[in-house]
Structures are given as structure tokens and as C-alpha cells.
Regions:
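Structural recognition of the conserved hydrophobic beta-strand(s) that form the central parallel beta-sheet
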Residues: 150-154, 167, 178-184
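Short, surface-exposed loop and linker segments with low hydrophobicity and enrichment for Pro/Ser/Thr
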Residues: 159, 168-172, 289-292
Length: 376
């Protein structure tokens, strides 16, 4: 992966290139930004430049190994969980073949996409102490090619505290010519100590224009590319899903529609609470990552409804794919209730992530929603 393959982010690419040219390579760097902004592919492209040099044609063997994600001095850490194949102490090294396939398919893919690809979507993958112990061994060995050794830690916010503390010891006294590239979508979940040890590189959401151009280069029509880019609000992974019709939006929309209809019905018919009980029970049977994705989808849809209600149609990207009357629904979302609804959804998300009882969490959220939808 080369800098020219990265969508947008020109200023950051130029800054990284200049720093490398002048020999300024901080041993610990943190690439962070929202979903689909390209932080992981950018980190890989930067690692390639550090390992192989700036001229692609001058070291073709090295560049080929990096492009195949098989360079012996390039190491990856990413969230995993025990699976049918690896029942105990699963670490990233166990999943490298799947990881390579995953990245070659779409380097902008999400954590949820990764979990789906290795069959752990019903679990909460993490980066644990065993993972870091394995990395410490690798980074302590002599470089295969006599140059740099690079570790890319994807979704660093998934590191537990013991793993973070163990890795900090390595970062504070790093072996010579070792480079740690952390990639995060939620910098607030990282410890202050870890952040303070890294040079921070913030990526912004991608512009619709940049994404549209990239999609056209991939062979999609201008109309398809433009529509997908506007809908995906800076997330290139979502744009790719829109043009390839792989997005879970229709399923989530159906869940959302059933949910809010039952919530509205409770005011006129108390027995409709039973529908919310059934709805909560059904969604609690899905994986936690699916539940969190649905909550994120719902939060975005409530915010889109607020824009619609205030006649800001030019900022609204949502278009129903079912019989959902979006315009009528949006009349119930205003400045009087959007903050409270957002807080409840974010709290539910946090509780799901903390392994709370999802059935109770969704039932509690549903009952609160019946009140908040009618708040004047």
C-alpha cells in the first residue's frame, strides 16, 4: 500500500513524507480519526516507506513483501477472541492469514467487519496481555533486514489495562530502530500515559468529493459514486458498502421501525409494552457488536430526524428503504428531546460494551424512549 493509494489526507501524507526524508521518525506515533477515514491504510503506507524507502522501484522485493503483508519486520496487533479454531489464548498471530485476506479486500473496513470475517461477531474482541507478550518477543529480536522493525496496533482502544501497561514498558525503553504505530477510532478510551508517549496524527473525515473520485477510479459511475459519498458522511468504508449493496442498513431500519412504532403505541395501549419486551428479547439474542452497531445507527437516525424537522434537508443523507414515514417521524424529534435521547443511546452502548445484560439494557432504553418521544 502506497501513499497514492490512500483517499485524501494529502496534508498528513506530505508531513509524513517530509519527516521521513529528514530522518525524523518518532518511535511511537498515534494515528487517530473517525471510522472510515483511512488511519489504518495510512499507517501501513507509512510503515512501507520506513521499511523500504521512498522510491518504490528501488527496493521492489521489500515493497512486494509489505504489499502482501508478509514482511518479516512488519508486525500487526489487532482485537481477537477465542473461536472454534483457537479455543484458548487467541492472539493476532493465530489469525494472520485471515487478516491479510481481510485487508486486501478492504483496508478501510470496520472492527465489526473484522469480527464478522473471523466468526466472532457475537463476542467482544480485545487486545490482551498475551498479545503484548508475543509482540515484546518479536520486537526484541534482531531485524531480519538489518533496518527498522515496525508494529502496527489497530484499534488500540481495545487494549485492556494490563496489556497497555506491559506495552508502555517496551515503548519507554524501546530497542533501537523500533517503530510503534497505534491506530485508534476512540482516542478518549486510551490512557493518558500512552497518549503522552506518542506523536499524535489526527485524521479528519473524508470529503464527499475525494471519496467520489476514488469510487470512480474503482470503476463505479459518477452517479453511484456521488450518491454513496454523500450518504456515507466521510466514511469510505460505508461508501464502498453503499455502492456494493452490502450495508446492513435495511435490517437496522426494520428493527428501528418496529422499535419506535411499539414505543409510540404504548401511550395509547399499555399492552404494547409486551411488544417492546419481545423486541428487546429478540435483539438481545444477536451479538454484542451487532447490538452496538444498531445503537450507532439509531443515534445517527435520530440526529438525521432532527435535521429534517428543522428543514435542513441539504444536510440530511438518510433515505428510507422500507415503508418508514421519515418526515412524519422527524416531527417528534426536536431540541427538547434529542440531547436526552442521545445520552440514553450512548449509555446503552457503553453498558453493552461493558458486558451488561443486553435484554435489560434494551428494555430500559425502550421504556425511556416511550417518554422521550413525546417530550415537548
Amino acid at each position: 500500500m502506497l501513499f497514492r493509494d490512500i483517499v485524501g489526507q494529502e496534508a498528513i501524507k506530505e508531513e509524513l513524507f517530509r519527516g521521513h526524508k529528514k530522518g525524523r521518525i518518532p518511535h511511537c506515533q498515534l494515528f487517530y480519526g473517525p471510522k472510515g477515514c483511512g488511519s489504518l491504510p495510512l499507517a501501513i503506507a507509512y510503515a512501507r516507506m520506513v521499511l523500504c524507502g521512498e522510491e518504490v522501484l528501488s527496493n521492489q522485493a521489500c515493497n512486494l513483501r509489505v504489499s502482501e503483508l508478509k514482511h518479516p519486520d512488519l508486525h500487526f496487533i489487532f482485537p481477537v477472541a477465542n473461536s472454534q479454531e483457537f479455543k484458548t489464548k487467541a492472539i493476532s498471530a493465530n489469525f494472520l492469514p485471515q487478516w491479510r485476506t481481510f485487508l486486501h479486500s478492504n483496508a478501510y473496513a470496520s472492527l465489526y467487519d473484522w469480527f464478522l470475517s473471523i466468526g466472532i461477531e457475537n463476542k467482544q474482541g480485545k487486545i490482551g496481555k498475551d498479545e503484548v507478550s508475543d509482540l515484546v518477543k518479536k520486537m526484541s529480536l534482531k531485524s531480519y533486514e538489518g533496518g527498522w522493525k515496525v508494529a502496527i496496533i489497530w484499534m488500540a482502544e481495545r487494549m485492556n489495562l494490563s496489556a497497555t501497561n506491559k506495552l508502555l514498558k517496551l515503548i519507554e525503553e524501546p530497542p533501537k530502530k523500533t517503530l510503534f504505530l497505534f491506530v485508534s477510532e476512540d482516542i478518549r478510551s486510551l490512557t493518558d500515559t500512552l497518549i503522552s508517549r506518542c506523536q499524535k496524527i489526527e485524521l479528519k473525515p473524508l470529503s464527499s468529493k475525494k471519496m467520489s473520485k476514488a469510487l470512480v477510479q474503482k470503476g463505479y459511475s459518477k452517479e453511484e459514486a456521488s450518491g454513496a459519498s454523500v450518504k456515507s458522511t466521510g466514511n469510505f468504508n460505508e461508501a464502498l458498502k453503499f455502492v456494493s449493496n452490502k450495508v446492513d442498513e435495511k435490517m437496522f431500519e426494520e428493527w428501528f421501525l418496529s422499535w419506535v412504532r411499539s414505543a409510540f403505541a404504548v401511550r395509547k395501549n399499555k399492552e404494547a409494552v409486551l411488544d417492546l419486551v419481545a423486541w428487546s428479547k429478540n435483539i438481545s439474542k444477536t451479538g454484542r457488536e451487532t447490538q452496538k452497531s444498531f445503537l450507532s445507527y439509531s443515534l445517527d437516525l435520530f440526529r438525521q430526524s432532527l435535521l429534517k424537522n428543522y428543514f435542513l434537508d441539504e444536510l440530511t443523507t438518510y433515505s428510507p428503504s422500507t415503508d418508514f414515514n421519515f418526515e412524519s417521524f422527524s416531527n417528534f424529534i426536536s431540541g427538547n428531546n434529542i440531547d436526552a435521547i442521545s445520552v440514553e443511546l450512548e449509555t446503552a452502548y457503553s453498558n453493552i460494551q461493558s458486558n451488561g445484560n443486553s435484554n435489560m439494557i434494551f428494555m430500559d432504553l425502550s421504556l425511556k424512549l416511550t417518554r422521550l418521544l413525546h417530550k415537548k
